């Protein structure tokens, strides 16, 4: 099981995956917004999304788990 974590303090702007989706290494899974900049969050390995831990509008801190992959 792998996790995708936030690299910065931000707000979740858009979630691009849902539970059960298959993602490949490098796919963008969500977009964060910080200081009016859009920050793409990419999968660092391939897998199936088992849980999306956040929803649009949520505030996240550096290191928060955003998505879990199987």
What does each model-found stretch correspond to?
Residues 1-11, 28-44, 69:
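Short beta-strand-turn/beta-hairpin segments enriched in glycine/proline and small hydrophobics
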Residues 8, 12-18, 22, 51-54:
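Short histidine-centered loop motifs in beta-beta connectors
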Residues 18-29, 56-65:
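Short, well-structured beta-strand-loop connectors
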């Amino acid at each position: 099981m792998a996790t995708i974590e936030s690299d910065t303090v931000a707000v979740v702007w858009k979630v691009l995956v849902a539970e059960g989706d298959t993602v490949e290494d490098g796919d963008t899974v969500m977009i964060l917004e910080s200081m009016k900049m859009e920050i793409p969050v990419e999968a660092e390995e391939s897998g199936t999304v088992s849980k999306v831990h956040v929803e649009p509008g949520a505030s996240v801190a550096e290191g928060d788990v955003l998505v879990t992959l199987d």
